[in-house]
Structure formats: structure tokens, C-alpha cells
């Protein structure tokens, strides 16, 4: 029998009818299986956005690395990661000019925090890549394992010390010729159960000592494990998120502390505040734009979305920002803060568990671990997977993919917000030196942009200039997903 779809809704209140197409009701989708495919997508896409960069080889790990910095200037509207160092530094300088003393004050605050933070700060957080076991563990366990291994290798780490001392150990560990770790392994054997007389699989867990040479250790220290982001609504495709190991975490924490301190002083930053305070900030920006605009002026707001924000950001750019922000600070402080972006420039993405294969005819299932993707015959894969593997092969080392460009999800939210705000800051009339000007709010990859101008041409010119300025620092405003309204009606980080 044919069902007329409109009949289905006749007896249904409008509210309920809407909810059938609305992604926020019911159970959120969870992902099952391995995230290997999604991670390969991320790695391949990130390289594609930076493909015109320069290839080099990391002398320590042998990993091929792509550096898009100061790459070709954009000629089209395709998303790209070719940030120009001088443009980023210029934007930082203007940000400081608009907020005298902001960087120095934030550095002083951060310096104090750096000297007081204890190691146990790193036990906060969920799943963390545990480099000693090469898999995810709760943060506290991963930290304990790292400290235990450090100690047995002659470093001075302890669980109650300062974080900065632990980070000194991390630095020393990277200079060591080899690191000895204790790994766990499973033995399976088939035995007959005495009671039921059936065959059962018995598992025993053993421990064995393993030596990692410098190269293997560095690869693990620079590895971000990947998982599939769960419970994302309104999306057809899942995506991969990263969980860094303990060597990287402490350094990232200090960088984000500094960036958070800067964001707190910026009226255009939607972080670190949330909820009502964020709405209040937005209201203030709108009020400022309305108050300062002449009656004859037009005001439009863009609810913006950036294309693949973190895949087009670049750690080398963050290094340049940090170098500039901390330029008047003591050497030790500058060094501690520059390590996170340097590690990210040399990061490796772990491809997860690999692929499941099953043979219908023989009722067999087997897992192909990520380590085998470099050598396995591609005839076993379908076409799309085959293309992915072919693309990623030159980047593979020990089941991890070299991923120099891009940031991975959720890593430097605060610092990337500072970069976004620095472009919003350039919209002041004294900088644009024309009839249009802009302001807005930035919260990680989300932004609201308000443009004022005497006429529609001016608005268009202002939006264009904002778009192009963003391009120069590796931010790609999505022309498909951003929409423009009269100021007063728009959405920001729903």
C-alpha cells in the first residue's frame, strides 16, 4: 500500500512534526568500530589543504613533513593552509597596539602559574594516549605509567612535584639514547574446560621489558592517538578527535594558560566564558557597533562558519605567535612555551586499531592492525579505502602517520581564538582607513562578524577584505555556510 507522507502529520502537532527532521531529539549517534578511516580522512585532507607547501624530512624520526607556511598567496576561494608569517606577526602587533600591555601582563600571570602548578594537574582529563602501552588509558594511569618509566630510566620525576620539573624530565627523556619500558601482552591458548568438556580460550597477561631506541621513543612521544568523536548530532559523517600523550600535555597546558589569560582581556573573544556571559559579550559588541554607527549607516552581521578550522591552522604559525607574545620575557619561559608548537609541527597521528575484515564464506573475522597498512596488498580493500591508503602510505611509520600541518580537533582552542580576534581587531576605522569597519566575536572556529558601511557596496567590500585578511593567516571563512543578516538577528555558537 502507498503511504502518503502528508497524511502522517495530519494528527500530529506542528511541534512534533518539526522534531522529525531536527537532530537534537532522541539518542545521539555513537560510533562503533575503529576510527582508522576517519583519521586517514583527516590526515589526507590536511595535507591536501597544504599541498603546495615544501616537503622536508625530520632528521630524528625520518618522517616526511609538509610545510605550507609562506606558501603561495591564494588565487581562488578554496580552503587552504598557507598562512603568511609576516601577516600573523603584523596582526599580533596591531592587537597589542589596541590593547597596550596585554601580552606582558598575561605573560607575568602565566609565569606565576607555571611556577606553582603541580604535576597532578595532568591527571585531569579523560582518555589519554599512554605511550608505554601504546593505547588509551585514563589520564591518571597514563601519568603514573610515564613517571614510573621515567624513574626506572634514571630521571627524577615524582607524582607530587611541580609540573615544570616533570617537563624538564620530558625534555631530558628525548635526548636519551634509549628508554626501557615494561609492556603488557596477552597470550591466548585453547584449552578444554573440565566441567563442560568444551574448548575455551584462556587469556593470560604477561609483562616484558622492551627497549625503545631514540627514534621509536620520539615517535611515541610525538604521537596523538585518535578516536571517533561520539554523540555528534546533525552530522552524517563521524570525525576523528585526538588525544595527546603525557609528553605533550603539560606543554599544551601552559600555552593554553597564556592564551586563556589573553582571551580574558579581549572583548571580542567568546572564550573562555560560556553561556550568559558569552551572550552579554555579544550584546556589548552589537551595542558598540550600533552606538558608533551613523544613522545613515548600514549594519550587517555574518553568522560565520570556518572551513576545517583546525586542519588549516598550523603549529608553525602558533610558534611565531608565541615567539612574538613572549619576546620581552626570560629565556626559560620562552623555551617552555615554544615546545608545544614545535612538538605539534612534528606530530604523528596514530591510525587507531586498523580495519576489521570478515569473510562471509568462511565465517572468519580478523583485524588488520594499522601497522600493516604500509605493506598489505590493496586488492582486499574497496575503492575508496584503497585511495585513502595509497595517499597516506608515504607518510606511514610504525602504524602512525606523519602529520605536520594542521592542529587536530580541540588542541589549541584559546590560542587559535587569539589569532581570530587579531583579525577582528583590524576592522577598526583607524586601521581600515576607508568608510567600512568591522567588529565581532570569535570563539575557537565560530565567529560572528558585524560590518558597518554607508551603503551595500561598502558592506560587500568590508566582508571581502575580512575574508581575504583571514585567508592570509590560514583562516577560511566558508562562503557556503556563512550567512548575512541585518544586525540584531543572528546566531553565535548555538
UniProtKB/Swiss-Prot annotation:
Domain of life: Viruses
GO CC aspect terms: host cell cytoplasm; host cell nucleus
Motif (Nuclear localization signal): 187-195, 203-216
Domain (RdRp catalytic) ranges: 286-483
Gene Ontology BP annotations: symbiont-mediated suppression of host gene expression; symbiont-mediated suppression of host mRNA transcription via inhibition of RNA polymerase II activity; viral RNA genome replication; viral transcription
Sequence segments annotated as region (Promoter-binding site): 249-256
Region: Disordered, residue numbers: 50-82
Catalyses which reaction(s): RNA(n) + a ribonucleoside 5'-triphosphate = RNA(n+1) + diphosphate
Transmembrane segments annotated in the record for this chain: none
Record EC number: 2.7.7.48
Primary localisation category: host cell
Location in or out of the cell: Host nucleus; Host cytoplasm
Keyword Phosphoprotein: yes
Family stated for the protein in its record: Belongs to the influenza viruses polymerase PB1 family.
Annotated protein name in UniProt: RNA-directed RNA polymerase catalytic subunit
Taxonomic source organism: Influenza A virus (strain A/Chicken/Hong Kong/FY150/2001 H5N1 genotype D)
Amino acid at each position: 500500500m502507498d503511504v502518503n507522507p502528508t497524511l502522517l502529520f495530519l494528527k500530529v502537532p506542528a511541534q512534533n512534526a518539526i522534531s522529525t527532521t531536527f537532530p537534537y531529539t532522541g539518542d545521539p549517534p555513537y560510533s562503533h568500530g575503529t576510527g582508522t578511516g576517519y583519521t586517514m580522512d583527516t590526515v589526507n585532507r590536511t595535507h591536501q589543504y597544504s599541498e603546495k607547501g615544501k616537503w622536508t624530512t625530520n632528521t630524528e624520526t625520518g618522517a616526511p613533513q609538509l610545510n605550507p607556511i609562506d606558501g603561495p598567496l591564494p588565487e581562488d576561494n578554496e580552503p587552504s593552509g598557507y598562512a603568511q608569517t609576516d601577516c600573523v606577526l603584523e596582526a599580533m602587533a596591531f592587537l597589542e597596539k589596541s590593547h597596550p600591555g596585554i601580552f606582558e601582563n598575561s605573560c607575568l600571570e602565566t609565569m606565576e602559574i607555571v611556577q606553582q602548578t603541580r604535576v597532578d594537574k595532568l591527571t585531569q582529563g579523560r582518555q589519554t594516549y599512554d605511550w608505554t602501552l601504546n593505547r588509551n588509558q585514563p589520564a591518571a594511569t597514563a601519568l603514573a605509567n610515564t613517571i614510573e618509566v621515567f624513574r626506572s630510566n634514571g630521571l627524577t620525576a615524582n607524582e607530587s612535584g611541580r609540573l615544570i620539573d616533570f617537563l624538564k624530565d620530558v625534555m631530558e627523556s628525548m635526548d636519551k639514547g634509549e628508554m626501557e619500558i615494561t609492556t603488557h601482552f596477552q597470550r591466548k591458548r585453547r584449552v578444554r574446560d573440565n566441567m563442560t568438556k568444551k574448548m575455551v580460550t584462556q587469556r593470560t597477561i604477561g609483562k616484558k621489558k622492551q627497549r625503545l631506541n631514540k627514534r621509536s621513543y620520539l615517535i611515541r612521544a610525538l604521537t596523538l592517538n585518535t578516536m571517533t568523536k561520539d554523540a555528534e548530532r546533525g552530522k552524517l559523517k563521524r570525525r576523528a578527535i585526538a588525544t595527546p600523550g603525557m609528553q605533550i600535555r603539560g606543554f599544551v597546558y601552559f600555552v593554553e594558560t597564556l592564551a586563556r589569560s589573553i582571551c580574558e582581556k579581549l572583548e571580542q573573544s567568546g572564550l573562555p566564558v560560556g553561556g550568559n556571559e558569552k551572550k552579554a559579550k555579544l550584546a556589548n559588541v552589537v551595542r558598540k557597533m550600533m552606538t558608533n554607527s551613523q544613522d545613515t549607516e548600514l549594519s550587517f552581521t555574518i553568522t560565520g562558519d570556518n572551513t576545517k578550522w583546525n586542519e588549516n591552522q598550523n603549529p608553525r604559525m602558533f610558534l611565531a605567535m608565541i615567539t612574538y607574545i613572549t619576546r620581552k620575557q626570560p629565556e626559560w619561559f620562552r623555551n617552555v612555551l615554544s615546545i608545544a608548537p614545535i612538538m605539534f609541527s612534528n606530530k604523528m597521528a596514530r591510525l587507531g586499531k586498523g580495519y576489521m575484515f570478515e569473510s562471509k564464506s568462511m565465517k572468519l573475522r580478523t583485524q588488520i592492525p594499522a601497522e600493516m597498512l604500509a605493506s598489505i596488498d590493496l586488492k582486499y580493500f574497496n575503492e575508496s579505502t584503497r585511495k585513502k591508503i595509497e595517499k597516506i602510505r608515504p607518510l606511514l611509520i610504525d602504524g602512525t602517520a606523519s602529520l605536520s600541518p594542521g592542529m587536530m580537533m580541540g588542541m589549541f582552542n584559546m590560542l587559535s581564538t587569539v589569532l581570530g580576534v587579531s583579525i577582528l581587531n583590524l576592522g577598526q576605522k583607524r586601521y581600515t582607513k576607508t568608510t567600512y569597519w568591522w567588529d565581532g566575536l570569535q570563539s575557537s572556529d565560530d565567529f560572528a562578524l558585524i560590518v558597518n558601511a554607508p551603503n551595500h557596496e561598502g558592506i560587500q567590500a568590508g566582508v571581502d577584505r575580512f575574508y581575504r585578511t583571514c585567508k592570509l593567516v590560514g583562516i577560511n571563512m566558508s562562503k557556503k555556510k556563512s550567512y548575512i543578516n541585518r544586525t540584531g538577528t543572528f546566531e553565535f555558537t548555538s
